[in-house]
């Protein structure tokens, strides 16, 4: 009998610790009054996907949240899948050229491509895992209903 009580007590302790953790996560995802500061948190991995699932209710935007982009779709997808931003790709191309005083005019002009001046496209990982984000920022990745 005492073994059963001990097991029941252990199960109860695990359930309570799990419930308090889930409750603290739900606090971050609860709707807030307008004007009140929203808590921010870092969401990475499974926590990010679960937060998006809860906030967006299964309705998501495409890979990039902005409808119009400075970078062409094929170029941005190549950079996305290679793990390289447009800035990093431009820096790698510039590193392959000889040093400044020796550059020929055509090579020097090639350094001034649009990729140097493009703004880096940021995704949900950049905004919510690399740095903290709020629920309203997470909602910007939800699709229209």
Curated annotation (Swiss-Prot):
CDD domains: IlGF_insulin_bombyxin_like. It is found in: Secreted. Pfam families: Insulin. Residues 20-33, 117-122 form a propeptide. Disulfide bonds join 44-129, 56-142, 128-133. One of its GO terms (cellular component) is extracellular region. The keyword Nucleus does not apply. Keywords: Cleavage on pair of basic residues, Disulfide bond, Hormone, Secreted, Signal. GO terms for molecular function: hormone activity. Residues 1-19 form the signal peptide. InterPro entries: Insulin-like, Insulin-like_sf, Insulin_CS, Insulin_family. The keyword Nuclease does not apply. SUPFAM superfamilies: Insulin-like (SSF56994). Belongs to the insulin family. Heterodimer of a B chain and an A chain linked by two disulfide bonds. This is LIRP. It comes from Locusta migratoria (Migratory locust). The lineage of its organism: Eukaryota, Metazoa, Ecdysozoa, Arthropoda, Hexapoda.
């Amino acid at each position: 009998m005492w073994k059963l009580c001990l097991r029941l007590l252990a199960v109860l302790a695990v359930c309570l610790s799990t419930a308090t953790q889930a409750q603290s996560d739900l606090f971050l995802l609860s709707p807030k009054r307008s004007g009140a500061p929203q808590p921010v948190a870092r969401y990475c991995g499974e926590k990010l996907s679960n937060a998006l699932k809860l906030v967006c209710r299964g309705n998501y935007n495409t890979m990039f949240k902005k409808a119009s982009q400075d970078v062409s779709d094929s170029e941005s997808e190549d950079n996305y899948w290679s793990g390289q931003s447009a800035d990093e790709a431009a820096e790698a191309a510039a590193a392959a050229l000889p040093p400044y005083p020796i550059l020929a005019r055509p090579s020097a002009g090639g350094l001034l491509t649009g990729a140097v001046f493009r703004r880096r496209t940021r995704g949900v990982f950049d905004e919510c895992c690399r740095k903290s984000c709020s629920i309203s920022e997470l909602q910007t990745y939800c699709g229209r209903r």
